Swiss-Prot record:
Ranges for region Disordered: 70-122, 220-243
Known role: Transcription factor; part of the gene cluster that mediates the biosynthesis of chaetoglobosin A which has a unique inhibitory activity against actin polymerization in mammalian cells. Chaetoglobosin A and its intermediates are involved in the morphological differentiation of C.globosum. Binds directly to asymmetric direct repeats present in the promoters of the chaetoglobosin A cluster genes.
A GO molecular function held by the record: DNA binding
Protein name: Transcription factor cheR
Description of what induces expression: Expression is regulated by the developmental and secondary metabolism regulators laeA and veA.
């Protein structure tokens, strides 16, 4: 048996044995293995590159010194004699070209890439081969159909190639009658077109070659056209109504997701004892507006003020009716007249409820804290050395334990009074900003009284929600939530102290501001507790 060196040629010799097409384009010919028998090199089968391009593999070039013997000292055998070459060149004795396989299921089937004549049947010299070599030489044992392509998306399983899809309909550019058959059959008795530059061979890139210049095609876009197309497809600038809808969606999401549930532990973490860590079991992620309940409510308040500013700017730009014309539908055929004003009032009432819950938790925590602190001082006096006789702590003595984050010893840590005052002032200022954006700025009285009152009434009539139906709706919503338009009672009895805050406003504005009045009364009660009691 011949050795491996005698069986396979080197890379240099394989290039000399390449087919005409691979030799001309300087490609590595993917022909089958080569058998050396008696100094004759026998190629097995055509080149796979030619088969993929549906081109007959041709080897009609005269290669000098291509066939070398396996043993040193043998002379190269000529490929064929001159007489055989003359017989092969004659048209009468030329062998028929091999039949083309109907492999029209891949975009590499591009006709017209044949440059030379077909391979003659007398190109091979007589030689002797074994039975095993004859089986390898039988072309019927090899399948060069489309099933040899591997579908990469199916984990390497052999599958049939995807058929060629029909070209898209471009309207007036290509009519149905102009869509021709793409079967790669060259015209009869016409030489196929030649491609001098191999880079133009579209079969190597998996795309379809142009069939005819008469068919209209879509021109490729330049960089300038692509840039202009991208800019034209960009989203148009949003108007006041779109901005208003976006803000409303954000505020509703914050109220229903972040501020729907507020527990005393949340207020404790945010205001009462921030230096002692978290006393609640709620897990918090990240920093920023959503860190504590106070941060979240301030963030929502800023969004509501921005929304009211957008509406005020839209109403100011429109002359005539003082109603909510700026956020109305610009075109009834494309915009639905949604109750945006009612949604804004709903956000306002919901935000007032959040502030009321926070202020109520602070007020109740300060009221409960003082008795527990006094009990803790008395307990320390009982257990101190040298103190007067008194009851000793035992099983029957209830240890004073706070309802808001008590420590292990049963006592209460010192309150962060400065932090409570600062956060309370910030929330109060935010409420005043919302009230001013919704109902207009408040004007102080003049020296004579009448002039200042007239100025206030005029400003009250210019507010964006100054329509009587809107004010009546807001007053009804506040009453439904439990706010009272009169002087508050109970823990808020001392509220504003007098009724001067409403002087200068129209009578209808009194019911609209009863939620703000209630919160201001509760805020003053918290200030009184912080001022009169010693929390330390």
């Amino acid at each position: 048996m011949a050795s491996a060196e005698e069986t396979f040629f080197s890379a240099a010799r394989s290039r000399r044995l390449a087919c005409d097409r691979c030799h001309r384009h300087k490609l590595r010919c993917e022909r089958s293995s080569v058998i050396v028998n008696g100094g004759v090199a026998v190629p097995l089968g055509p080149c796979k590159r030619c088969l993929k391009a549906c081109i007959p593999c041709q080897t009609v070039q005269t290669i000098s010194g291509a066939f070398t013997a396996a043993k040193t000292g043998d002379t190269p055998v000529p490929r064929r004699s001159a007489r055989e070459a003359d017989q092969a060149a004659s048209p009468a004795k030329r062998a028929p070209s091999p039949a083309r396989r109907p492999t029209a299921s891949t975009p590499r089937n591009v006709p017209g890439l044949i440059h030379d004549d077909t391979l003659s049947g007398t190109d091979t010299a007589p030689f002797e081969i074994s039975v095993a070599d004859a089986a390898m030489l039988d072309v019927s044992n090899f399948d060069f159909s489309g099933s040899e392509f591997i579908d990469l998306g199916s984990n390497g399983v052999l599958s049939s190639p995807t058929p060629i899809q029909s070209p898209p309909d471009h309207g007036s550019l290509i009519r149905d009658s102009e869509i021709r058959d793409r079967t790669p059959i060259p015209p009869h008795n016409q030489p196929p077109p030649r491609y001098d530059d191999f880079a133009n061979d579209l079969s190597c890139f998996g795309t379809m070659a142009p069939k005819d210049d008469t068919i209209s095609t879509l021109p490729a876009l330049t960089d300038v056209e692509k840039a202009s197309t991208g800019s034209s497809k960009s989203a148009p600038e949003r108007g006041p109504r779109e901005e208003c809808s976006q803000r409303l969606l954000e505020i509703h999401g914050l109220l229903l997701n972040e501020l729907q549930c507020i527990t005393p532990a949340d207020v404790t973490d945010a205001l009462m004892f921030p230096e002692n860590g978290s006393f609640s079991g709620r897990t918090r992620t990240g920093q920023g507006p959503g860190n504590t309940v106070v941060h979240r409510v301030l963030f929502t308040s800023e969004r509501l003020i921005e929304l009211l500013s957008i509406i005020r700017a839209a109403d100011t730009a429109i002359n005539g009716d003082k109603r909510e014309a700026g956020i109305g539908p610009r075109n009834t055929s494309s915009f639905v007249d949604l109750p945006i004003v009612i949604s804004i009032l709903t956000c306002y009432v919901g935000l007032l409820s959040v502030y009321h819950a926070i202020f109520s938790h602070i007020y109740e925590a300060l009221r409960v804290y003082e008795p527990l602190r006094a009990a803790k001082i008395r307990q320390r006096a009982w257990t101190r050395r040298g103190s007067v006789p008194g009851p000793k702590p035992g099983p029957g003595l209830v240890q004073p334990r706070a309802i808001y984050g008590a420590d292990e010893a049963g006592g209460r840590p010192a309150l962060n009074v400065l932090g409570i005052r600062i956060q309370l002032e910030i929330m109060t200022h935010m409420l005043e900003q919302i009230d001013s954006a919704l109902f207009g700025p408040r004007v102080a009285h003049g020296a004579d009284g009448d002039e200042g009152r007239t100025d206030t009434i005029n400003r009250g009539g210019e507010v964006m929600f100054g329509h009587p139906a809107t004010k009546a709706l807001l007053a009804t919503m506040l009453s439904h939530e439990g706010y009272d338009s009169g002087v508050p009672v109970g823990p808020f009895a001392d509220g504003d102290g007098d009724d001067d805050d409403d002087d200068g406003y129209m009578e209808g504005m009194r019911g609209c501001r009863m939620g703000f009045r209630t919160l201001m009364g509760l805020q003053k009660n918290i200030r009184r507790l912080l001022r009169t009691n010693s929390f330390g």
